[in-house]
Structures are given as C-alpha cells and as structure tokens.
C-alpha cells in the first residue's frame, strides 16, 4: 500500500501540473494531502515525495527557474518533511496527550475524555479557520488567530522535547502573520484544508490502537 500511495501521489502532482492554470486546480493538491495522510497511517515512505512535489510546483509557478530558486525550493521541501514527521505525526499525538493528562489527572474526568475534547476542539478550530479565510469580508485579526490556533493544536510547533522550540516557532509564526503587510489568504486557506484532510487520513492509524485495546489473541501493539 505504501508504494501504491507513493506512485499515486506523484501521478497526481503531474495531473495538477497539467491543470495548474485552470480554476479549482488546487483540488489536486488537496487530494494529494489526503492520500499522504492515509499513507502516514501505513508507512512514512510517502513523505519522500514531498521534495519532488515542491520542485514540480516551483517549476510550474516560476517559468524561469534558477539554481538559487531550486535550492530554496529544496530547502522548503525538507522543512515540510521535517514538520510533517516531527510536527504533525508526533506533535498531534503529543498535544492530544497533554489534553488527556489535563482532563484525567487535573479535572478528574474518565479516561479518554481528554482525547474526545481534543478532537472536538481541533475540528472546531480548523472549521473556524477555514471559514474565516472564505468570507467575503475578511477579518484579519480573527483569521490570523484561528490559523495560529489550528497550527498549535495540530502539534506542528512541537518539534523535539520540551516547550522552548514550540514557543519560539509559535512566536515566529505570530510575528510573521501580524507584521506582514499582505497575507496570501488563498494560500492560508489551501494550507488549512490540506492539513485538515491530512489529519482525516492520518486518523486511519487509530485502527492499530483500537485493535490493540480490544486485546485480540495476536496483539503486537498492546498499549500496556
């Protein structure tokens, strides 16, 4: 399945390249993000397609590419791979764990109550952020706050152990959004939709934990 997702994702970026100048071409990007989320639940091999995807995107959007631009595109792709591997894949579970500890250990609520609360809050945050980027009359402050909140809840800044890196990355994102004179709203909307479908696809990994909790006769992923 991992090889299938890898081949399919690369084929889809070529389909996007053909239709990049047409309306609603970004739907191919969203489909790629969803398939990447599904593939993460199987194997991380699919993330190796990101540098190729970024290069195809760069060469299509910039008709006169340069060596400097190519190197920058590669660096951006490596950063995206790092954010996916150590941000979304691990950070999402880490933030969910913080909620679980807060609700169970601090509030004295039943097990998994923090997980349910986190899923509801994350879904509400993503829907709010996407809704803010689709309004006819944009409210910049609300849009930026909802975007930052969604990024934090997705665990993207939580790279490594501790809170220092998370605080620095969140502060840098906040400073960039509020200090920039012009923010690309379409880009923010595309990022949010892609992240949302990645999480939906990544949720397929929950099957491993659900099956392990059921205590089947062959249980190699037992939480205990």
Question: What residue spans do the PLM features occupy?
Answer:
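Membrane-interface micro-motifs in multi-pass membrane enzymes
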Residues: 1-6, 10, 14, 107-124, ...
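Juxtamembrane "helix-exit" motif on the non-cytosolic side of transmembrane helices
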Residues: 84-104, 131-135, 154-161, 179-181
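Membrane-interface alpha helices of multi-pass inner-membrane proteins
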Residues: 29-41, 149-159
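Membrane-interface transmembrane helices that cradle and orient dolichyl/undecaprenyl
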Residues: 9-29, 36, 55-66, 127-143
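Membrane-interfacial entry segments at the cytosolic side of transmembrane helices
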Residues: 26-27, 63-75, 107-117, 136-147, ...
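Transmembrane-embedded, aromatic-rich helix segments that form part
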Residues: 45-57, 90-91, 163-173
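Aromatic-rich transmembrane-lumenal/periplasmic boundary elements in polytopic membrane proteins
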Residues: 193-224
């Amino acid at each position: 399945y991992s090889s299938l997702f890898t081949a399919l994702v690369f084929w889809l970026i070529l389909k996007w390249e053909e239709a990049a100048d047409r309306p609603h071409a970004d739907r191919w990007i969203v489909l790629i993000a969803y398939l990447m989320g599904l593939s993460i639940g199987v194997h991380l091999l699919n993330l190796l397609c990101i540098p190729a995807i970024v290069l195809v995107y760069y060469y299509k959007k910039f008709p006169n590419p340069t060596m400097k631009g190519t190197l920058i595109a590669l660096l951006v792709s490596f950063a995206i791979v790092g954010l996916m591997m150590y941000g979304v894949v691990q950070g999402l579970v880490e933030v969910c764990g913080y909620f679980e500890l807060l609700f169970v250990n601090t509030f004295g609520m039943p097990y998994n109550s923090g997980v349910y609360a986190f899923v509801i809050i994350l879904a509400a945050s993503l829907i709010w952020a996407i809704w803010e980027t689709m309004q006819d009359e944009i409210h910049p402050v609300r849009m930026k706050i909802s975007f930052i909140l969604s990024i934090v809840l997705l665990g993207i800044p939580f790279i490594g152990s501790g809170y220092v890196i998370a605080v620095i990355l969140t502060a840098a994102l906040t400073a960039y959004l509020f200090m920039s004179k012009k923010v690309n709203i379409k880009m923010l909307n595309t990022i949010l939709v892609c992240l949302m479908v990645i999480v939906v696809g990544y949720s397929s990994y929950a099957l491993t934990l659900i099956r392990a909790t059921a205590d089947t006769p062959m249980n190699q992923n037992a939480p205990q």
